[in-house]
UniProtKB/Swiss-Prot annotation:
Encoding gene per record: lysR
Species per Swiss-Prot/TrEMBL record: Escherichia coli (strain K12)
Highest taxon listed in the record's lineage: Bacteria
Domain spans labelled HTH lysR-type: 1-61
Similarity remark: Belongs to the LysR transcriptional regulatory family.
Record key words, sorted: Activator, Cytoplasm, DNA-binding, Repressor, Transcription, Transcription regulation
Matching CDD domains: PBP2_LysR
Lineage: Bacteria, Pseudomonadati, Pseudomonadota, Gammaproteobacteria, Enterobacterales
BP terms from Gene Ontology: lysine biosynthetic process via diaminopimelate; positive regulation of gene expression
Protein name: Transcriptional activator protein LysR
DNA-binding region boundaries: 21-40
């Protein structure tokens, strides 16, 4: 027996849906004789009489109606496949795995994700916070589609694009005497209650060295693991600190005072792409979204720092 092909199913579905050979031919953009010929061939191939022909009109048989029920189920499945393909082509569907430092998942990512997901509502994102150096190891192992780090080193098996570079900033509780200054110097921290990151943090080590070189002694009263925790404690009046500008910007809206530091301590955001993990249009779309959205944070930070009162 000859094989049934998709064209046979398409013609049968069109005839059942349209109710006549003429309308079916119109739906399929072909001629009525072609539809009639292929429908007869389909009946012969499957060995079933699908229609009764009465006075030039087609009437489905019981077998035809039952077969149409099965065709309908398959037809809807085919529609879903076509729709899914269109969605993937237009980035409307898909999954994206992003590994990043915890500071990024708590600062700029939430506000950048909202407009992206509004544009692609059927996309799902998996955000995996991780500290260095394990973060860079995961990216080298090609475990995620994209990575966001503060390192200036490119992990093995990846490519790195610098997205943003800003200086660390000083953070103070509302009403602190130093808040009247527009720029703080290392000497301003002499004898002040200071909230620091953990001893293993590279920025903690850099700042400790800087204050030592300037012979400034701070009162190291609290040590914590994250910049978000530092900012929360500063806002509550526990002490003052120097932190990354992104976390400071996030807390500025809730009362944290942010000031420039007289010494540049660069803080960099880098986008990491694994070289041996299959890329996709979705990866490219999100990368472009990050590159377009991050500069807006610079504008917001500059506005806050520029509004500081000069002593």
């Amino acid at each position: 027996m000859a094989a049934v092909n998709l064209r046979h199913i398409e013609i049968f579905h069109a005839v059942m849906t349209a109710g006549s050979l003429t309308e079916a031919a119109h739906l399929l953009h072909t001629s009525q004789p072609t539809v009639s010929r292929e429908l007869a061939r389909f009946e012969k191939v499957i060995g079933l009489k699908l229609f009764e022909r009465v006075r030039g009109r087609l009437h489905p048989t019981v077998q035809g109606l039952r077969l149409f029920e099965e065709v309908q189920r398959s037809w809807y499945g085919l529609d879903r496949i076509v729709s899914a393909a269109e969605s993937l082509r237009e980035f409307r569907q898909g999954e994206l795995s992003i590994a990043c430092l915890p500071v990024f998942s708590q600062s700029f990512l939430p506000q950048l994700l909202q407009p992206f997901l509004a544009r692609y509502p059927d996309v799902s994102l998996n955000i995996v916070p991780q500290e260095s150096p394990l973060l860079e190891e995961w990216l080298s192992a090609q475990r995620h589609d994209l990575g966001l780090t503060e390192t200036l080193h490119t992990p093995a098996g990846t490519e790195r694009t610098e997205l943003l570079s800003l200086d660390e900033v000083c953070v103070l509780p509302p009403g602190h005497p130093l808040a009247v200054k527009k720029v703080l110097t290392p000497d301003d921290f002499q004898g002040e209650n200071y909230i620091s990151l953990s001893r293993t943090d590279s920025y903690r080590q850099l700042l400790d060295q800087l204050f030592t070189e300037h012979q400034v002694k701070r009162r190291m009263i609290v040590e914590t693991h994250s910049a978000a925790s530092v900012c929360a404690m500063v806002r509550a009046g526990v002490g003052i600190s120097v932190v990354n500008p992104l976390t400071a910007l996030d807390y500025a809206a809730s009362g944290l005072v942010v000031r420039r530091f007289s010494i540049a301590v660069p803080f960099t955001v880098s986008l990491i792409r694994p070289l041996h993990r299959p890329s996709s249009a979705l990866v490219q779309a999100f990368s472009g979204h990050l590159q377009a959205g991050l500069p807006k944070l610079v504008t917001s930070l500059d506005a806050i720092l520029s509004s500081a009162t000069t002593a």
